[in-house]
């Protein structure tokens, strides 16, 4: 097996080594690279065009728009989930069987059903805590005592609800829930704020219970079973399409001698483990060889492991032989790769079951933080002690989870953490919210440069802060980083946008790709709007608004509005010229290669000269040249044409197969770094701005027609194509709820990672709309909220997003 040092590598490296060692590829030379779903469009075209029985029926059940792109999206999404499971086909077939339930008894045994019953009980308990808080307020000397009797009766009603164990029980019990009117008795000795707080809490309880009924209890278990049976054949068709797609993709990779990162893991898994007919898993001879060879297995960043990796690690360790030689290191509070289907639950299961006493399965809590000053650590502990709960994220921020200062720093002043809130500009055309926040940060950086000292890494002494000591962390770079960079540049502050995925976000590439999307299909409003505002259209916001408002049909495509615009003569001529350009380029796509099409566009618009004249023009020009290189290389593969190139680039962007911006930055350069929180993981900076906290959480996936969970399968809307109606199903609602809570838990962990990047000073920033009103509301919240109120989905969503109600 070679020297032991050769196994100090990533788990995928170990998987590849194991695969090659077993002669998986013989003498064949293979290429290891990320393979996005770049040929899914062609596969879906064949299926959607009648190549697979029932394909159209599957999409019509899922959505009223029977399009290849929709089918492609579903197949790629389900493929992504299945390959995160140790045996992908087994997962897909399990999802099919999940829908083939025959009665209420089988329904009650499904994972999503059990999750729902537990979730309803948790929400009722939340209502109980709110009512108990209201009762305590009513019992105060200045409290609304006249409400006490009714509140007690309502508390008894909730106690009865907590006895429920089945959906059938709750379906019937919620039909009988009723709230009377609070007594109207007036008493001047009652504190007005106390009265309002009790009324507010009771209103929240009523709304929460009504939401539960509307979301989960409108159909009886029998009706739920019937709808699942109706959907079963369409689910089966869709999932068999995924199996077919996987087979075709695997075949294509074999022909081209390509393996991707998931292949590495699955090849290694199948070498190390054997699945028996009864479903059990046994170690292979190869696994036993590894067990005998490895004395210890040390795993770093264990919180980011997935289920496939867990099986592999377990296979090569000696646990089955009672040889406990796995040492797993990680911090579940920093597990921020759920979108890559990491399983923090693996870490949590061990965290909650292993004892901190000496033994075979022992947990060792590494509490000391050797990065940050006490001021930073105190801020992190204060915030997360209030918002991180076991119910949301699987871990309570208690003494075992809290940070303790271990770093030694020279005495200094001004290290207190700061929360900077900026008022949202009233006139967006003058300055948008992001620019306002960036300007506020720039002004704070100017003051830091004048007065703040940091500890020099080499000497250990204090010195004036430099630009390179400062980082601005963003939840997402897209749409934020370049704007921040431009504002800082105007303020005379050098800045650099760091990030592997900067290529697709750059203006020069984004504008071209939007233009190609429009040439592929002009009836796409969002790309078309971007093109109209770019150098390819040169329309102003006011002109687009005039065109958009020229029709009373609000559902009309923007392209048709442009094409049919007949009002102002000058603008009409501009619209006609724009449409003629698009039509001309669309005609060229039938005989020009992608490279030739791009060269034609760039020549006619003098695009390289335009790009070179922009700030950082040399780098931007290199990005454009890189796009031409990629276009030339694309058509050497199996697929041709604009449609496939657009899909190819979309998949590269979606699956983070990015090239990074052309050019690099010297690490010693004295510039402010702007980067995503994910990019910053593992890094540290003397001064960290955590910016953009007014940005709302992205919950778009929970509202889509198809939602997927690796443990609970898939849920989808119930669509009647004949009646052209759509309604949400119970299963989809449950999966969407779980997804939403998982996303919120992930947002908690992302915030934790961001705040713990700071070594000496932490500054948190955000934008407030209706500044004075929001500040007053926040003060009231602090004055009249008890710590005992649990952090639920609704409360957590409001932590920043509801308070800072901006997009």
Regions found by a protein language model. Name each.
Residues 75-259, 361, 439, 458, ...:
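Conserved ATP-driven helicase/translocase motor core recognized via long
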Residues 269-291:
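Conserved helix/coil segment N-terminal to the catalytic DExD/H
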Residues 31-46, 243-248, 667-668, 740:
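Short, hydrophobic/aliphatic alpha-helical segments
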Residues 80-114, 118, 142, 214-218, ...:
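Conserved motor-region signature of P-loop NTPase helicases/translocases
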Residues 694-704:
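Cytochrome P450 core scaffold surrounding the K-helix E-X-X-R motif
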Residues 218-229, 245-251, 255, 422-428, ...:
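Short glycine/proline-rich turn/loop motifs
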Residues 536-538, 549-552, 668-671, 723-791:
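C-terminal accessory regions
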Residues 1-72:
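Gly/His-enriched, cation/cofactor- and phosphate-binding structural elements
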